[in-house]
């Protein structure tokens, strides 16, 4: 389906529910799921306000004026999600999609120096031919690395990825004391030190606690991303 009903779209999408028609554009299959992504056209029209209508938004996108993670995207339904870098080519404005306590996901302006950097959470790894390892990341990206590099990187770790050179610049291990942010659920956008881990048989459902100053919030392991050893290594808040 190309569209879905406004009333059934993810609740955090910044669209009017009772005006503007019955339908709204639906994210196409891609690096992020429907529940945790925004169609590119909605970002152009409703978030950044570069267009007043869907027709105008589609025109801007079809002209190649928008890059996602450094690649021109002309599909107005392209799903944009967690930690993606959005660049408006004619103006030079660059944004990153980050978890936000009020908006669920928000776009924050970033510098051109950070435009080539992206935090990727490791979802798993597999052995491939040649004695190498393939890392699988949260945005659907895969990367083949040597055993020397890959053996130190584990599921739930985070890497700082260079979008331009397509390599890993930094490895941030998942461990107590690391800085993390909640990426989904009721505590989305909350960030702090990883304070506690209560392991369960289903690892992704393990309970973790983040502490910021004296405030402690709990969520499940699958809903957090490590962003730095002591503090975020790149800008992830306004």
Curated annotation (Swiss-Prot):
Pfam families: Ribosomal_S4e, RS4NT, S4. Keywords: Ribonucleoprotein, Ribosomal protein, RNA-binding, rRNA-binding. HAMAP family: Ribosomal_eS4. One of its GO terms (molecular function) is structural constituent of ribosome. This is Small ribosomal subunit protein eS4. GO terms for biological process: translation. CDD domains: KOW_RPS4, S4. The gene is rps4e.
């Amino acid at each position: 389906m190309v569209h879905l009903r406004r009333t059934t779209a993810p609740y955090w999408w910044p669209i009017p529910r009772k005006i503007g028609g019955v339908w709204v554009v639906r994210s196409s299959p891609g690096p992020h799921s429907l529940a945790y992504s925004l169609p590119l056209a909605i970002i152009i029209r409703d978030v950044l306000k570069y267009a007043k209508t869907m027709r105008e938004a589609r025109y801007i996108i079809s002209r190649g004026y928008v890059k996602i993670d450094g690649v021109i995207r002309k599909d107005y339904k392209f799903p944009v999600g967690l930690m993606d870098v959005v660049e408006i080519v004619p103006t030079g404005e660059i944004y990153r999609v980050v978890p936000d306590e009020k908006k669920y996901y928000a776009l924050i302006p970033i510098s051109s120096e950070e435009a080539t950097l992206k935090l990727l959470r490791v979802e798993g790894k597999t052995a491939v031919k040649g004695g190498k390892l393939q890392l699988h990341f949260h945005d659907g990206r895969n990367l083949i690395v040597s055993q020397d590099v890959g053996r130190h990187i584990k599921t739930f770790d985070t890497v700082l990825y260079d979008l331009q050179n397509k390599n890993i610049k930094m490895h941030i291990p998942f461990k107590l004391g690391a800085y993390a942010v909640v990426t989904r659920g009721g505590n989305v956008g909350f960030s702090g030190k990883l304070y506690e881990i209560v392991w369960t048989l289903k690892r992704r459902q393990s309970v973790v606690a983040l502490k910021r100053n004296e405030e402690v919030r709990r969520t499940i392991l699958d809903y957090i991303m490590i962003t730095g050893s002591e503090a975020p290594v790149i800008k992830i808040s306004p």
